[in-house]
Regions:
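Peripheral, non-catalytic segments of secretory and membrane proteins
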Residues: 4, 8-150
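Short, composition-biased motifs enriched in small/polar/acidic residues
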Residues: 148-284
């Protein structure tokens, strides 16, 4: 099962109104929420919007329009910004007229926790030194990850389409399945699988059932991605009008290409049906 939704165009800040401040010893507090409209936007692929310092003014994280469609090259003043690699690492450059370039680099290791949205690590400015994204007094936290625009309104972020196909005209909605693997292009995005590879899709690869003390447990292994979280969905039958019920335990992906997890279902039943639900980080 694959769930998700998209917004299009420019986004208001994704930063929490209560957890919004970074700190630098030589610059003071920096507000990532800013005025709520022009504040920082942490995206699935790139960051955009502005952060604000009372001492140096507005600092741009990027314009949300990288030349290649999915990530800033950071090789020119017209194509700069902070990239998100999808697994939490933030790399690239921010810029402010009164502070110059701010480097999101490996030594400071700026990153965002995909499960909590909390930013951590440090960013570097040649003019003011290190800026901490979290400390004992304050943290920066994003409430969501902006998927980016969807110009062709097919339910797939343009940035993901450019990443996968270098175009936005190849993948489509209405059940279109570019690689013919039985999984639609939209579902491939929601699971972050390759829409051009028929062997790459979200699927259960192993399943076993345990009965002990009249209780039932299922152990499932499925294909997984480091960019997604998962939940078990359960149904007792496939009769008309049946529904799946989600077990509200968020399962992080294991290292590697598959994840194995146990679902304890309580009192054993005559039959049960299970499926795996893929979730974008911080999605409802």
């Amino acid at each position: 099962m694959l769930l998700g939704s998209l917004s299009s165009g420019w986004a208001a800040t994704t930063i929490s109104a209560t957890n919004q401040f970074a700190y630098g010893a030589n610059i003071g507090w920096i507000n990532w929420h800013a005025d709520g409209t022009n504040g920082a936007v942490i995206g699935e692929f790139v960051c955009s919007g502005f952060i604000y310092s009372a001492n140096v003014g507005w600092i741009s994280l990027g314009g949300n329009a990288p030349d290649n469609g999915f990530q800033y090259a950071n090789t020119s003043a017209s194509d700069f910004g902070v990239n998100h690699d999808g697994i939490g690492n933030l790399r690239g450059y921010a810029y402010g007229a009164n502070i110059g370039w701010i480097n999101f680099e490996n030594t400071g290791n700026p990153r965002v926790n995909l499960q909590t949205g909390v930013l951590d690590g440090h960013i570097w400015s040649a003019n003011v030194g290190w800026i901490s994204l979290s400390n004992a007094f304050a943290v920066v936290k994003t409430d969501s990850f902006f998927p980016g625009g969807d110009k062709d309104e097919d339910g797939i972020p343009d940035q993901w389409e450019y990443l996968q196909t270098n175009d936005i005209e190849i993948l489509s909605d209405e059940g279109h399945d570019e690689d013919g693997d039985g999984v639609s292009d939209v579902q491939e995005y929601l699971a972050d699988t390759d829409p051009l590879d028929a062997n790459d899709n979200l699927r259960i690869t192993a399943h076993s059932v345990l009965f002990e003390d009249a209780k039932e447990s299922h152990i499932l292994t499925w294909t997984s991605r480091p960019t997604r979280f998962y939940k078990f969905n359960i149904a007792d039958n496939f009769n008309p009008g049946f529904t799946f019920t989600s077990i509200n335990i968020l399962i992080p992906p294991a290292p590697g290409s598959t994840t194995t997890e146990k679902a304890d279902l309580g009192v054993a039943a005559d039959q049960r049906f299970l499926r795996i639900e893929a979730l974008r980080p911080l999605s409802p």
